[in-house]
Swiss-Prot record:
Top-rank lineage group of the source organism: Eukaryota
Protein name as annotated: Flap endonuclease 1
Residue segments, region Disordered: 95-118, 353-382
Biased composition (Basic and acidic residues): 96-115
Gene: Fen1
Organism for this UniProt entry: Glossina morsitans morsitans (Savannah tsetse fly)
E.C. designation(s): 3.1.-.-
Length: 382
């Protein structure tokens, strides 16, 4: 879920914090990508006749095809991707996970009815709702990335939190995910739609964390409280308080504790045993691996290894796999030039440097004039 309604709220309150961009504008950038979100996209998008792609044994291969070709597209655009995988979810997320399980059960029942009725549109819709990224999907993706020479990070907990930590440490430029809580975790830049297929023709949406805080007039701590009021993965919001009202309350009272003192409890229903303080702590001090201990390196692809991985039981076309491996190698060699702004830095002039230079120039001119004047003796004027 991320943060309920945050994207629209930012667009309404501070549209200057969002800009649309083309994927090619991130040439030379290192980007931390929410791997689970990507795998989910690939599982629901890479389909043949309404079903996921599988091998002869019925094992799903959609996620691998998506990961392979979408990563190549990123590399071809000069982006250096770092995939970040989820670890164990925090206990506070159990409520949200239970809701997701319940929604899948409802989708399963709806799918059965749609199948009986022969309603293909509904069958496809509910099939998508049943998609879940498994541990096996993640492990296969890690094996593939290793063969492609692309680094990945296993987060101890939430992938978005780890991505944000990498951004804050300067290890990467941005977080790429569809979940808005990357901003709540403090990612300086959030990129949405970066891993969407080219066929969808959707521009990359770039969110600036600094501009979001400035636009809302909130500190990072206050912004976290706003996100909790909106509703997050760790706890529900307060019934009756929508995005606009939540923003007004935060601007007036600055924290949830004061809001709870001031609001009319008869008008607004506060959840029983509301664990907003736990949610706040998870955003302020998330469990992440120390970015300084993570070495992010991109290697040459293992072409033969990729062929063995794809062309055995998974039955991919060998020529296409080898072609993909060669594209990765070509991208790696072209990326060595990097971005121009990584080579040149603007160094501010020391105080007083410019006036001194002008004074020196003036003195030099005077000296030259003196010398010239001395040399004109005995010369015929022109």
């Amino acid at each position: 879920m991320g943060i309920l309604g945050l994207s629209k709220l930012i667009a309404d309150i501070c549209p200057q914090a969002i800009k649309e961009s083309d994927i090619k504008n991130y040439f030379g950038r290192k980007v931390a990508i929410d791997a689970s979100m990507c795998l989910y996209q690939f599982l629901i998008a890479v389909r043949a006749e309404g079903a996921q792609l599988t091998n002869v044994d019925g094992e799903t291969t959609s996620h691998l095809m998506g990961m392979f070709y979408r990563t190549i597209r990123l590399l071809e655009n000069g982006i250096k991707p770092v995939y970040v995988f989820d670890g164990k979810p925090p206990i506070s997320k159990s409520g949200e996970l239970a809701k997701r399980a319940e929604r899948r059960e409802d989708a399963q029942k709806a799918l059965e009815k749609a199948t009986e009725a022969g309603n293909e549109a509904d069958m496809d819709k509910f099939n998508r709702r049943l998609v879940k990224v498994t541990k096996e999907h993640a492990n296969e993706a890690k094996e593939l990335l290793k063969l492609m020479g692309v680094p990945y990070v296993e987060a101890p907990c939430e992938a978005e939190a780890q991505c944000a930590a990498l951004v804050k440490a300067g290890k990467v430029y941005a977080t790429a995910t569809e979940d808005m809580d990357a901003l709540t975790f403090g990612s300086g830049i959030l990129l949405r739609h970066l891993t969407f297929s080219e066929a969808r023709k959707m521009p990359v949406k770039e969110f600036s964390y600094a501009k979001v805080l400035d636009g809302f007039g909130l500190t990072s701590q206050e912004f976290i409280d706003l996100c909790i009021l909106l509703g997050c993965d760790y706890c529900d919001g307060i019934r009756g308080i929508g995005p606009k009202r939540a923003t007004e309350l935060m601007n007036s009272y600055k924290d949830i504790e004061t809001i709870l003192e001031k609001i009319d409890r008869k008008k607004y229903t506060v959840p029983e045993d509301w664990n907003y303080q736990i949610a706040r702590e998870l955003f302020v001090n998330p469990e992440v691996a120390d970015p300084s201990s993570l070495e992010l390196k991109w290697f040459d692809p293992d072409e033969d290894g990729l062929v063995r991985f794809f062309c055995g039981d998974r039955q991919f076309n060998e020529d296409r796999v080898r072609s993909g491996a060669k594209k990765i190698l070509k991208c790696k060699s072209s990326q060595t030039q990097g971005r121009l702004d990584s080579f040149f830095k603007v160094i501010p002039a020391a105080c007083g440097t410019t006036p001194k230079r002008k004074a020196d120039d003036k003195n030099n001119v005077q000296q030259k004039k003196s010398k010239t004047a001395g040399n004109t003796k005995g010369k015929r004027p022109k």
